[in-house]
Amino acid sequence: MRKIIHIDMDCYYAAVEMRDNPQYRDIPLAIGGSADRRGVISTCNYVARKYGVRSAMATAYARKLCPDLVLVPGRMALYSEISQQIRKIFLRYTDKIEPLSLDEAYLDVTDSELFSGSATLIAQDIRRAIFEETQLTASAGVAPCKFVAKIASDENKPNGICVITPDTQDAFVKTLALGKIPGVGKVTLQKLNNMGLFTCQDVRDYPLDAFVKAFGKFGPVIWDRSHGIDERELSVSRKRKSVGVERTLAQDITTDEECLAMLESLYPKLLSRLEAASPKLAIQSQGVKLKFNDFQQTTVEHRHQVLDKTYFKTLLSEALERRGTRGIRLVGLSVGLPETADVQQMVFNFEHEQNR
């Protein structure tokens, strides 16, 4: 039985700013772009979340929810530097590490002899080391597989740990709301709910063939997760060709302005994933993908060796010329990596993005 730890830093960017600026600790704080430039919230502290502020929210709307919100632009170079410091802490415990972004990673400690092989004690010690050396808190999930560990890390946030043992995993999974499953976003969740499916137990009681017919290739994934099955290994050393983020929309968007706002929302996520995969931000291309409401899609990708948000806007304009009168149901950004990048291809779907 495997022992997987998911470490997730607590409101990472905001936590760094509060650490370095104590005056921010007890006030609503967010990292993101300004409202007058159609900015988007990258993350916020827990004080701001009490007002309903969330990541990927338009800054202008966040200001309406919380007029006293303090907004700072963020310091990505510093966040990346601290992330590398945290990664070095991970390496003291295992070399089987799959970074997901600057603020979260999977660790496989199945073969570790530290703490007599106790994944729980290893996770506790990792959290201790992170706090002692960075003055930042991390939450941890411990489980026999990746997706359960990821869900568990969110159970006792902030600054908590949740352990799901092989004996308790089935009971934990079957009561989960389907929206908790990574990859199940608003669109998929609404379809599940319309079928009368709300928990993993509901999926278990549903005929498999009918379920797969309804959801296509994603059907077996939801089915497996609902049964607590996730046999994916950690991605630690294969060649990554690209990094991308995309979001499927609950409602089609129809204007260029809405597409630009979505680009602003996705860009910080892409930057975070890229910095985890390629700390020097080495790229060889940038691309934009649009999927239309007739399920046709278009991708515009050009060689570009310096990451540039403005260039994404140029690519988006080119892609929008192919739209005609169709609505847009998915927007994606991607970068191609040099062949020397010792990482693997991955696209992240943020239709279900959780607030950390």
From Swiss-Prot:
InterPro entries: DNA/RNA_pol_sf, DNA_pol_Y-fam_lit_finger_sf, DNA_pol_Y-fam_little_finger, DNA_polymerase-Y, DNApol_IV, IMS_HHH_1, Rev_trsase/Diguanyl_cyclase, UmuC
Keywords for the protein's UniProt record, in alphabetical order: Cytoplasm, DNA damage, DNA repair, DNA replication, DNA-binding, DNA-directed DNA polymerase, Magnesium, Metal-binding, Mutator protein, Nucleotidyltransferase, Transferase
Chief place where the protein resides: cytoplasm
EC number: 2.7.7.7
Pfam families noted in UniProt: IMS, IMS_C, IMS_HHH_1
GO cellular component terms, A-Z: cytosol
Catalytic activity: DNA(n) + a 2'-deoxyribonucleoside 5'-triphosphate = DNA(n+1) + diphosphate
Active site: E104
Cofactor stoichiometry and binding remark: Binds 2 magnesium ions per subunit.
Domain of life (superkingdom): Bacteria
Subcellular location: Cytoplasm
Gene Ontology biological-process annotations: DNA-templated DNA replication; error-prone translesion synthesis; SOS response
Cofactor(s) essential for the protein: Mg(2+)
CDD domains linked: PolY_Pol_IV_kappa
Binding positions for Mg(2+) per the UniProt entry: D8, D103
Domain UmuC: 4-185
GO molecular function: damaged DNA binding; DNA-directed DNA polymerase activity; magnesium ion binding
Site (Substrate discrimination): Y13
NCBIfam families in UniProt: PRK02406.1 (NF002677)
Similarity-based family: Belongs to the DNA polymerase type-Y family.
Function noted in UniProt: Poorly processive, error-prone DNA polymerase involved in untargeted mutagenesis. Copies undamaged DNA at stalled replication forks, which arise in vivo from mismatched or misaligned primer ends. These misaligned primers can be extended by PolIV. Exhibits no 3'-5' exonuclease (proofreading) activity. May be involved in translesional synthesis, in conjunction with the beta clamp from PolIII.
PANTHER family the UniProt entry points to: DNA POLYMERASE KAPPA, DNA REPAIR POLYMERASE UMUC / TRANSFERASE FAMILY MEMBER
Subunit structure: Monomer.
Protein name: DNA polymerase IV
Organism from which the protein derives: Pseudoalteromonas atlantica (strain T6c / ATCC BAA-1087)
Gene behind the chain: dinB
